[in-house]
Amino acid sequence: MPFVERVFSGVQPTGNLHLGNYLGAIVNFVKMQETHNCIYCVVDMHAITQGVDVWGGPVELARNTREVTAAFIASGIDPKKHIVFNQSQVSGHAELAWIFNCVARMGWLGRMTQFKEKAGKDRENASVGLFDYPVLMAADILLYRATHVPVGEDQKQHLELSRDIAQKFNNDFGDSIRAQGTNDGLFFPLPEPFITGPATRVMSLRDGTKKMSKSDASDNSRINLTDDADTIAQKIRKAKTDPEPLPTEEKGLEARPEADNLVGIFAALADRSKADVLRDFGGGQFSSFKNALAELCVTKLAPIAGEMKRLVADPGHIDAILNEGSDRARAIADETMKLSKDIVGFIRRR
């Protein structure tokens, strides 16, 4: 019996969502809901794996969780057709993560490059949660026996670990799984990356060699999803460029990071190729191109900012969406945990 095709997407509530988050992830989340059964999770348990100085404390975490939810809804995700919830409301995430902690090997986690990057040189003071982050991510995905996960370059290694954990669980408990009569001895699927086409990598508006980031000291380096129309237009017009005209061919963007970034943003927002954009603007000055880009950004993003502002002003409404979504998520998760506990040999309440 094949697994039900299901896509699991998670976003950390780290605050200050920006254009990079929108074009790199949220746009694709909106597109895939038209063709797939989707679960959208605000992964607030992952958010606290680093120090409180990073995630901001309880008040900030709650505010950021609601802001991510508002961004989902304002961008077009339908919480009635698909599941939108926050991770901490479903205890199965933590329960399954513990089982997976006993399946995963230390050597597997020791090879995870993101831990090394986030912990830096002071690894002895990093939290166990940060080291164990990939195991919780595997539990997030497999709790819903999701078959596909949209991942960026920085998460591909973690998805591979999820597959390894699923495979080892299936092997370690094969006899018990077969006794349950489940999928020819396979309880968990091996989740595949969800491919939506080339991802848009959005760079800083002040330095085209660096990713757009919420942690950049300059607010002019990014377009926040909460920026109003005037602020968006002003940031685009102040964006760093070089003195040369725009090239007429895509190859001419090489070694011109700021030009490449702005053309890429235009292409992504207009759903066109860079070559197509350059056919319209190649050979011209940046001033006229920036005016067109500012207008496009305002057209696409200002309505999202307005709707986010409206939603965030009513936290009770957002909480109701998360509560309803968590009830639907829990119905799936509870069935997975019931069977997982039976397979492992845990005695559970009946």
Curated annotation (Swiss-Prot):
Matching CDD domains: TrpRS_core
GO molecular function: ATP binding; tryptophan-tRNA ligase activity
Localization per record: Cytoplasm
Intervals of motif 'HIGH' region: 13-21
Keyword Isomerase: no
Record keywords, A-Z: Aminoacyl-tRNA synthetase, ATP-binding, Cytoplasm, Ligase, Nucleotide-binding, Protein biosynthesis
Motif ('KMSKS' region): 211-215
Annotated ATP binding sites: 12-14, 20-21, 152-154, 202, 211-215
Binding site for L-tryptophan: 140
EC assignment: 6.1.1.2
Catalytic activity: tRNA(Trp) + L-tryptophan + ATP = L-tryptophyl-tRNA(Trp) + AMP + diphosphate + H(+)
One Pfam match: tRNA-synt_1b
GO terms under biological process: tryptophanyl-tRNA aminoacylation
Gene Ontology CC: cytosol
Entries under PROSITE patterns matching the protein: AA_TRNA_LIGASE_I (PS00178)
PANTHER family: TRYPTOPHAN--TRNA LIGASE, MITOCHONDRIAL
Role noted for this protein: Catalyzes the attachment of tryptophan to tRNA(Trp).
Assembly notes: Homodimer.
Family of this protein: Belongs to the class-I aminoacyl-tRNA synthetase family.
Name assigned to this protein: Tryptophan--tRNA ligase
Species assigned in the record: Bradyrhizobium diazoefficiens (strain JCM 10833 / BCRC 13528 / IAM 13628 / NBRC 14792 / USDA 110)
